Amino acid sequence: MGDKARRKWLVLAAWPYAYGVPHLGNLIGSVLSADVAARFLRLAGDEVVFVSGSDMHGTPIEVEALKRGESPKDLAERNHEKIKELFERWEISFDNYSKTESPTHIKFVQDFYRRVYENGYVFSDTVQLYYCPKDKIFLPDRYIVGTCPYCGYDRAYGDQCENCGRLLEPTLLLNPRCAICGSTPELRTTTHWFFDLPKLTDALKRYIEENENLPPNARNMSLQILRDGLKPRALTRDNKWGIPAPFPGAEDKTIYVWMEAVLGYISATIEYFASKGEPEKWKEFWLDPETRSVYFIGKDNIPFHTLILPALLIASGEKYVLPWTVASTEYLLFRGLKFSKSRRIGVWIDEALEVFPADYWRFVLVSLRPEQKDMSFTWEEFLRIVNNDLNDNIGNFVHRVLVLVQRKFGGIAPAPLDFADEDLKFREEILARSREVAEFMYAFRFKEALTHILWLSSSGNSYLNFRKPWELDSESARTPAFLALHAVKALAIMLYPIIPRSSQEMWKLLGYKDDIANHRWHEINEAVPPGQELPSPRPLFRKISEEELKAAVEKIEELRASRSS
């Protein structure tokens, strides 16, 4: 995993909607998972561009701004800045966190759709759309709810059922109602512009069938949608808060928020390289077929990234690299229930940082990452993971080793003597775990990677208990102390993508003066240099008592009460 075989990666996190603060499920489903990937790939020596941004347009922002008596732009900008600041506090290492209201994005979207239109993939048609006579607005997809005609779910949206994942049209819903006021809407005639998705059926089928990197759930869902038959997708909306549609005759329309935000991955990359004074370099990523683009999304976003986005990229006539894979997750629940702000179910990312450090949360969320099935967050599980895994397993091993070196060798990393069988076995485990963890990281299976990291620290504790170097004379304690320090270095590097701040602290406690991010994964193979001076040891983590946890939960409730009053 040295620098000689550098790959180019686009690490792309689904764009948070600037309607409010994301919750923990949103975070692990996209942005946090993408950050773990980006940090690992940089450690691996690859060339990485990691972007996301705030999705600022659409009816929800427009309606909320109306209620508050302010402009949609002011509301969205304020929320964007808040979300951006929160991501910084969560240690998210974006190369660029952009927004759909940026001039670069607006220009790119309009130019992009002009090309799609000129290539014959856009047509206009008169359609009947739901209109709420009470609120006096046309109701876009997400503002119509009703019963899914496929699975019977009674809270399906007009564009997609979140229960079965099927793409929908508002008129397909049974018992439709206005999501704003709950009244029954009426159908009215209006003209809209559509993306001719069915024209691209064969190209999409080839892309899905030939792409061996797509996970089974994404492949199967996409093929099922193709078998059911694709339908044209609306490109325009009647609401005013959005990017003006560039099609002739569509001067009073805006681009549908889903169909413009999904292009933000490209515009954010363009914006990033322009800010670095390299305005053409984005093409080295987006127009190079060897580039690996990975989209970190929840399972409800799969069709937009495996079908609609590839179709748009193909329709543009440019040679944009199609999604290499989607790293989709199942749902993170809160005590078995979906997160809901109105019902106070869940924890939001601003609240979380008011009670515990970001690294504690990052560690817990990766431990609970719903890679194969829905996972449930509970406060009891949070306490168990922090106390047992982070503190007692990793923290205890690291501190034991550092204290041993301080007491036996005056804080100077020792050189080894002869290696006994148990020493050789432990050294091989360090190297083997490094390879295994890297494989899971490259497969974006971070929960499993963390399990193997924990196995290494558990083995380290067992190794120390077996060798008992504190009972040996200084000469005999050299080899076990040398290997234990090697394991701590391995843990610092392997944990860096997950808990970056704590890993940097671990790095400093090993006597390194620089930033761990400047090092490479393959350096796990190298032990801490004998003679390196270590600072005085101090615990990296601490246990959380049940009383402290109870106080934290109460503090979150108090914060919510103060905000709603």
From Swiss-Prot:
Q: Which GO terms describe its biological process?
A: methionyl-tRNA aminoacylation
Please report the name of this protein according to its UniProt entry: Methionine--tRNA ligase
EC nos: 6.1.1.10
What species does this protein belong to?
Thermofilum pendens (strain DSM 2475 / Hrk 5)
- InterPro entries to which the protein is assigned, alphabetical: Anticodon_Met, Met-tRNA_ligase_1, Met-tRNA_synth, Methionyl/Leucyl_tRNA_Synth, MetRS_core, MetRS_Zn, Rossmann-like_a/b/a_fold, tRNAsynth_Ia_anticodon-bd
This protein's major location comes to: cytoplasm
**Binding sites annotated in the UniProt record for ATP:** K341
Q: In chain numbering, where does the motif 'KMSKS' region fall?
A: 338-342
Per UniProt, where does Zn(2+) bind? C148, C151, C161, C164
Query: What GO molecular function terms would the record report?
Result: ATP binding; metal ion binding; methionine-tRNA ligase activity
Q: Which Pfam families does this entry report, sorted A to Z?
A: Anticodon_3 (PF19303), tRNA-synt_1g (PF09334)
Any one GO CC term of the record: aminoacyl-tRNA synthetase multienzyme complex
Query: Where does this chain carry the motif 'HIGH' region?
Result: 16-26
**Top-level taxon of origin:** Archaea
> Which UniProt keywords are listed?
Aminoacyl-tRNA synthetase, ATP-binding, Cytoplasm, Ligase, Metal-binding, Nucleotide-binding, Protein biosynthesis, Zinc
CDD domains under this entry? Answer: Anticodon_Ia_Met (cd07957), MetRS_core (cd00814)
Family affiliation: Belongs to the class-I aminoacyl-tRNA synthetase family. MetG type 1 subfamily.
Q: Which reaction does it catalyse?
A: tRNA(Met) + L-methionine + ATP = L-methionyl-tRNA(Met) + AMP + diphosphate
Localization recorded for this chain is: Cytoplasm
Q: What cofactors does the UniProt entry give for this protein?
A: Zn(2+)
Q: How is the cofactor bound?
A: Binds 1 zinc ion per subunit.
* Functional note: Is required not only for elongation of protein synthesis but also for the initiation of all mRNA translation through initiator tRNA(fMet) aminoacylation.
